[in-house]
Amino acid sequence: SMPKFNKENILVEVYNLILDSETTDTERKELVIFKDEVEKGLDFDNALMKLADHLRLIGLDNVLKHRSMSKKVNKFYMKINSVGQFKKNFGIYFPPMF
């Protein structure tokens, strides 16, 4: 079933990534936007989905520029990544058919 993420745990993780010196400015910008939106009371799942999508775009851009995502942000992205793709496409999670 859909991974359900704990809001407080995710926020703590995001705060730590924002403060981490290895986090790039581009990554940090997206993390700060997410943090601000959640603190303003925006829907957590939607904000997380948007963050996953934006980190995915950063990842694709990095590939084109032969850069890599900072290690901890990449690990965090891998964890939340599943939420964006499935929820957006179907509203519910369907396991891949292959």
Describe each region flagged by the PLM:
Residues 1-32, 95:
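Short terminal alpha-helical segments
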